[in-house]
Amino acid sequence: MVDFGALPPEINSARMYAGPGSASLVAAAQMWDSVASDLFSAASAFQSVVWGLTVGSWIGSSAGLMVAAASPYVAWMSVTAGQAELTAAQVRVAAAAYETAYGLTVPPPVIAENRAELMILIATNLLGQNTPAIAVNEAEYGEMWAQDAAAMFGYAAATATATATLLPFEEAPEMTSAGGLLEQAAAVEEASDTAAANQLMNNVPQALQQLAQPTQGTTPSSKLGGLWKTVSPHRSPISNMVSMANNHMSMTNSGVSMTNTLSSMLKGFAPAAAAQAVQTAAQNGVRAMSSLGSSLGSSGLGGGVAANLGRAASVGSLSVPQAWAAANQAVTPAARALPLTSLTSAAERGPGQMLGGLPVGQMGARAGGGLSGVLRVPPRPYVMPHSPAAG
């Protein structure tokens, strides 16, 4: 606190009279009263709404959550309104203290007149005749000093007491929680994903059907563009179907490769019949690949892929597709009689192993329908060369 007693009355009086006065304090008190009144009205309105939630038509868990969220805010408005009202009252106390100090402060003109009188008395005090008057003047100035100091000390004490009872204002409580905001965002995202999935389920079949059967006047690029926009966000199921089709085609290619390998192996045993059987099997495999590609193209990747376990034909320890046995029937329906062996004509039966149409006896005797095209060279007669010595 400032030591107002050490300051002359000229400074204290000048400070008190140079200020704006108590008008600003009175205006501030009125504004605080208005704020307090508005807060009380808002708190009352909020409280009535909260009470209506518990007894009105909106009753349930949502109403309970609303009451729990709004009640702290209503309490805060009531407390803040009381603090605003107290602030207005204390501002009025400070304004009253100012008015009191202002009334007790010696007006600056009076102090200036006293000082001017003192200077005159000193200037005319040639023989000491003004000494009593100078003493009286100094006593009056001392009283002015003490009066201004007392007024300032009283004003400082009153304002300190008024401001000491004021409490700091608190911020409004949060009516929403971070967890609730996160749950809301998760719910919105889940709803968006569900809507997108439903839209995909509804749009993909129609788009595929339109792509398979394009109408006149519509360019393929527009169809493909619309299909891509529809399918692009959710390409995983279609990618899986394409992958399954590729796997099936890869298996077919592997079968063709195995057929070519078997062809090379059998060329040394039965060149003509084996080559014909393997060529027929390879053609069947190619036709199977073509039918697979056409079925996938016509159904818009909608056709299923079928597979059987334990249904393959066998060549020794090698498992081969069933189509190879069917292709082998075209080589020779039944083995012919073997004139140079003890084997008789074999009756035509169902498809057996891959070498069922290539009798071993025929290969040994160089006879049979499957090997009828083998070149036979008759023995050539030996001609004795003519000797020059014989003449």
Curated annotation (Swiss-Prot):
Chief subcellular location: secreted
Cellular-component GO terms for this entry: cell surface; extracellular region
Keywords: Cell wall, Secreted, Virulence
Domain comment (free text): The N-terminal region is responsible for interaction with TLR2. It is also important in mediating tyrosine phosphorylation of SOCS-3.
A Pfam family this chain is assigned to: PPE-SVP
Induction statement: Expression is positively regulated by Rv0485.
UniProt cross-references to SUPFAM superfamilies, sorted A to Z: PE/PPE dimer-like
Job of this protein: Could be a crucial virulence factor for intracellular survival of M.tuberculosis. Favors development of Th2-type response, and down-regulates the pro-inflammatory and Th1-type response. Specifically interacts with the human Toll-like receptor 2 (TLR2), leading to an early and sustained activation of p38 MAPK, which induces IL-10 production and activates Th2-type immune response. Also inhibits pro-inflammatory cytokines IL-12p40 and TNF-alpha production.
Family (UniProt): Belongs to the mycobacterial PPE family.
Subcellular localization: Secreted, Cell wall; Cell surface
Known partners and oligomeric status: Interacts with human TLR2.
Stated name of the protein: PPE family protein PPE18
Domain of life: Bacteria
Provenance organism: Mycobacterium tuberculosis (strain ATCC 25618 / H37Rv)
GO terms for biological process, alphabetical: response to host immune response
Record note on disruption phenotype: Mice infected with the ppe18 deleted strain have reduced infection burden in lung, liver and spleen and have better survival rates compared to mice infected with the wild-type train.
